[in-house]
């Protein structure tokens, strides 16, 4: 937001210097990025009147001018500007004057007594560009007729004015105007605010333009009026051009300048249509697929049902709240106009300009929220300026209200405000702050019930009001105190470990931590979670980050692709983050949003060689069992079951559901071949995702006696049907450990699998497989006898034979 200080002080004039005012605004949250003079330093440049103009005797493009510069003697100045004429008033650089340098950092341009083609020139007539006031170099800068001859140009044009540039946060849409800044300045400093004097314009016509609002979710209020007989060629007043240019807006034409001026003055974007180019009435509606519109910037865009438009009986005329169309644009030949000012719902404008790769001042304001109570008032203001400058006759204001925001009161507890701000602010002082801010409130004890005004779209919760109290009270008045807390030793819960410890454990297993956005592409949710109805964001920062994730798999694959694109060959990453799942059973709370569960999960991905390449070890790609081993180490000493199951993101034959104590806690497996092909991955990564709670919980360590006697190891090979899962056999052997005969069994591990290549290979049928297990037994009290070991092995085999038809391989 850029504006001249002189414009601001027409609304509020605190007894502060420019620097003090800048500091006050910054400390109240309106950061002043820069202060710069309206014009560079100049010397001996005054207002002069051209008395006579004659052709140069020796140059076709030069004129010899007689100029009254208030010096007491007429000056002869040679000038080549095409618009020089007797009677005009222009800036005159006297001999000895210093003009701003032509290039930044250069030396000032000194004016000397000189001869041009043999004719003496006693100075120079200046253009706006030569004074560094604008880029206009089409001719001399012509000053208003009432400007005193001989007056210093800095005084005549207020060139010692200061231009403020303020960096506004997105919530401060109410400050996107000079009056909005003035309103804040009055609240901050206590200086009186002079509101603009806007009076209704007398309607000399009865004509109105038929308006239909077909989309109340697009436009809540639409105000407009017909004005006939305007002179579009009228010259914009110098004072308006000056303010616009110092606000960063170049002058275009009187009608356009007036619309822009009121936008900068009051914060209300408006649009002026050429009435004679409108076919019938206008309809405010959503666009339709297949429609197109040529905009004022010359671009032709394709419309759809997500963007709002203003159309007439023949075609679309404007991109609602963003930019007008070329077909109804005003020109210098326009004589009849339709003036429009509306309230557009912020959600209906937000992101639409970015969709077409451009931005406008109107969209910037409307997508943040513009006062919906002042559309008629602003139409009256624009109308009066048009009639004053361009003439014409106005019709009545047609004001249609279909749906406006319902502003519910927001409660703030004074006690909580004091606790958060860290300083005691009295309730009466809080009441004064709200009054200065123009916030209507009711008091009930220490509770303030504030009704947000129509121009404040940023006040929704208690913390918003606390922020208002803090910044108007003054951040500088809040003492800097070090935090004070009790220093006490708390007992450590040995049945739980921190997520920080889990992250360290993964890092120790050669996984690098990554942090990703919780919002992802909707396509990722379909691919990696099979979710066609994700939690959608109301205001995504980008179209590819429009939904909340329900799995970490997509984020991890995204990191993998990023690294592969940079020639990484081995990638092992993990993330500890939240996912967001719709769950009607979740109630609202301090850290909960009603209807949405936000569990924290740990996800990891391994890709490429198992270990870095080295001369003593053969290179092989990481597989399911490598990552399964990492996960088992992470869960230890808690045993986990890996049950064959299918997940949308994982290979149907190489994936499993992770279960702990009979509860599903996560997934593990290779990436689905379909996704591997879609995301152009040379090899399949292996991934797992598990609830953090399953990793955090752990049993108390129980010391056990270390046996003095050696363990006994026996290998058994059993033949089972190929459909029998190894996990099922492990489950049965685990049940057998409850038998007294198996009390010395310490561990059972699979070390080999064999499948027949033909019907008679290895004594196996085509539908059978051989599984080899290594059983470790140990007794802490003595050496195990062969009879005891044989009995334990036989018990395990009998159990598998009874349930799954297993037999010992001969």
UniProtKB/Swiss-Prot annotation:
Coiled-coil annotated residue ranges, if any: none
Positions bound to Mg(2+): 458, 464, 467-468
Domain B5, chain residue ranges per copy: 405-480
EC number, as in UniProt: 6.1.1.20
InterPro entries named among the record's database cross-references: aa-tRNA-synth_II/BPL/LPL, B3/B4_tRNA-bd, DNA-bd_dom_put_sf, Fdx_antiC-bd, Fdx_antiC-bd_sf, NA-bd_OB-fold, Phe-tRNA-ligase_IIc_bsu, Phe-tRNA-ligase_IIc_bsu_bact
Record localization: Cytoplasm
Lineage, uppermost ranks: Bacteria, Pseudomonadati, Pseudomonadota, Betaproteobacteria, Burkholderiales
First-tier enzyme category under EC: ligase
UniProt family annotation: Belongs to the phenylalanyl-tRNA synthetase beta subunit family. Type 1 subfamily.
Organism expressing this protein natively: Burkholderia mallei (strain ATCC 23344)
Catalytic activity: tRNA(Phe) + L-phenylalanine + ATP = L-phenylalanyl-tRNA(Phe) + AMP + diphosphate + H(+)
Residue span(s) of domain tRNA-binding: 39-154
UniProt entry keywords in alphabetical sequence: Aminoacyl-tRNA synthetase, ATP-binding, Cytoplasm, Ligase, Magnesium, Metal-binding, Nucleotide-binding, Protein biosynthesis, RNA-binding, tRNA-binding
Cofactor comment: Binds 2 magnesium ions per tetramer.
Entry keyword NAD: no
Residues spanning the membrane: none
Domain FDX-ACB: 707-809
Gene3D superfamilies assigned to the protein according to its UniProt record, in alphabetical order: 3.30.56.10, Bira Bifunctional Protein, Domain 2, Ferrodoxin-fold anticodon-binding domain, Nucleic acid-binding proteins, Phenylalanyl-trna Synthetase, Chain B, domain 3
Name of this chain's protein: Phenylalanine--tRNA ligase beta subunit
Cofactor(s) needed by this chain: Mg(2+)
Highest taxon of source: Bacteria
Cellular compartments per GO CC: phenylalanine-tRNA ligase complex
GO terms under biological process: phenylalanyl-tRNA aminoacylation
């Amino acid at each position: 937001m850029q504006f001249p200080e002189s414009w601001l002080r027409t609304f509020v004039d605190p007894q502060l210097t420019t620097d003090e005012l800048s500091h006050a605004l910054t400390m109240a949250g309106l950061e002043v990025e820069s202060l710069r003079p309206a014009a560079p330093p100049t010397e001996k440049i005054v207002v002069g009147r051209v008395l006579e103009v004659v052709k140069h005797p020796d140059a076709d493009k030069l004129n010899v001018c007689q100029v009254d510069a208030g010096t007491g003697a007429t000056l002869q100045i040679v000038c080549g500007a095409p618009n020089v004429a007797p009677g005009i008033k222009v800036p005159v650089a006297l001999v000895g004057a210093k003009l701003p340098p032509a290039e930044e950092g250069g030396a000032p341009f000194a004016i000397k007594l000189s001869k041009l083609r043999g004719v003496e020139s006693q100075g120079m007539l200046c253009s706006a560009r030569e004074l560094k006031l604008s880029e206009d170099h089409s001719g001399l800068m012509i000053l208003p007729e009432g400007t005193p001859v001989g007056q210093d140009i800095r005084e005549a044009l207020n060139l010692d004015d200061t231009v403020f540039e303020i960096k506004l946060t997105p919530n401060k849409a109410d400050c996107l105007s000079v009056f909005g800044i003035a309103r804040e300045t009055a609240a901050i400093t206590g200086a009186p605010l002079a509101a603009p004097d806007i009076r209704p314009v007398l309607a000399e016509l009865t004509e109105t333009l038929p308006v239909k609002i077909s989309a109340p979710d697009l436009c809540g209020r639409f105000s407009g009026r017909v004005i006939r007989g305007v002179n579009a060629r009228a010259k914009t007043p110098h004072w308006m051009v000056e303010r616009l240019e110092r606000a960063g807006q170049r002058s275009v034409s009187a009608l356009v300048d007036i619309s822009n001026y009121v936008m900068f003055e009051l914060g209300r974007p408006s649009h002026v249509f050429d009435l004679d180019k409108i076919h019938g009435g206008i309809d405010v509606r959503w666009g339709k697929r297949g429609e197109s519109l040529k905009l004022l910037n010359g671009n032709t865009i394709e419309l759809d049902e997500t963007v709002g438009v203003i159309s007439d009986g023949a075609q679309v005329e404007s991109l609602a709240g963003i930019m007008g169309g070329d077909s109804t644009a005003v020109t210098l030949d326009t004589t009849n106009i339709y003036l429009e000012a509306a309230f557009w719902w912020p959600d209906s404008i937000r992101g639409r300009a970015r969709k077409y790769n451009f931005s406008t001042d109107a969209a910037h304001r409307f997508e943040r929220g513009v006062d919906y109570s002042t559309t008629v008032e602003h139409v009256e203001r624009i109308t009066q300026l048009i009639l004053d400058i361009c003439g014409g006759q106005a019709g009545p204001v047609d004001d249609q209200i279909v749906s406006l925001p319902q502003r519910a009161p927001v409660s703030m507890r004074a006690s909580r405000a004091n606790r958060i701000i860290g300083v005691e602010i009295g309730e009466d002082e809080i009441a004064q702050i709200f009054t200065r801010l123009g916030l209507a409130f009711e008091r009930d004890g220490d509770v303030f019930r504030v009704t947000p005004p129509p121009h404040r779209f940023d006040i929704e919760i208690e913390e918003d009001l606390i922020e208002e109290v803090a910044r108007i009270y003054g951040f500088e008045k809040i003492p800097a105190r070090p935090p004070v807390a009790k220093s006490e030793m708390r007992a450590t819960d040995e049945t739980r470990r921190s997520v920080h410890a889990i992250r360290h454990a993964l890092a120790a297993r050669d996984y690098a931590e990554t942090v990703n956005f919780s919002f992802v592409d909707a396509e990722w949710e379909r691919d990696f979670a099979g979710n066609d109805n994700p939690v959608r964001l109301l205001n995504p920062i980008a179209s590819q980050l429009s939904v909340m994730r329900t799995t970490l798999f997509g984020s991890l694959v995204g990191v993998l692709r990023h690294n592969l694109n940079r020639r990484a060959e081995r990638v092992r990453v993990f993330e500890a983050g939240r996912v967001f799942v719709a769950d009607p059973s979740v109630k609202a709370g301090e850290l909960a949003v009603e209807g949405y569960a936000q569990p924290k999960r740990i996800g990891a991905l391994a890709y490429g060689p198992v270990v870095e390449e080295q001369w003593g070890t053969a290179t092989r790609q990481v597989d399911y069992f490598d990552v399964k081993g990492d996960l088992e180490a992470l869960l230890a000493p808690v045993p986990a079951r890996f049950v064959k199951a299918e997940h949308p993101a994982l290979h149907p034959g190489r994936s499993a559901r992770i279960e702990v104590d009979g509860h599903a806690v996560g997934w593990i497996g290779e990436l689905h071949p379909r996704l591997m092909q879609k995301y152009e991955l040379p090899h399949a990564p292996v991934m797992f995702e598990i609830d953090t709670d399953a990793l955090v919980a752990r049993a108390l360590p129980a010391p056990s006696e270390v046996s003095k006697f050696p363990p006994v190891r026996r290998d058994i090979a059993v033949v089972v049907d190929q459909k029998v899962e190894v996990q099922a056999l492990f489950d049965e052997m685990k049940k057998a450990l409850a038998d007294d005969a198996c009390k010395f069994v310490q561990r059972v591990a699979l070390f080999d699998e064999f499948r027949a290549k033909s019907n008679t290979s290895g004594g196996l049928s085509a539908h059978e497989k051989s599984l080899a297990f290594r059983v470790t037994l140990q007794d802490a009290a003595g050496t195990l006898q062969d009879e005891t070991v044989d009995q334990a092995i036989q018990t395990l085999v009998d159990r598998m034979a009874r349930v799954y038809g297993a037999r010992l391989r001969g």
